[in-house]
Amino acid sequence: AVALKYEVGEEGAPVILAMGRGLMAEKIMHLANEKNINIFSSPLLARALYFTGKIGKEISEDLYASVAAILAYIFKIEKGEFLEKPEIEIPSDLQFDEYGNKKVED
């Protein structure tokens, strides 16, 4: 799980607040639920952020479009719109398995 912070109107890209695997991921998601923070499930994106990012740093520029699509979706549903969950595209060179190995195209 990866927790991001982004303030509309602020300069800069979203920042990684927390990230973890296994038990830590469960704690991150539990805390988000407790605080009524929307959770968007995309294991492929979570892995890309986890294996290319650092806590306290902005996300990789290569993931801007993927994260922007999610943020746009979340902002709209927070305003009461009912939308289908978008399909998130992850650049092929940033696709990892759960162990951090780059995915090999078939």
What role is predicted for each listed range?
Residues 1-106:
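Divalent-cation
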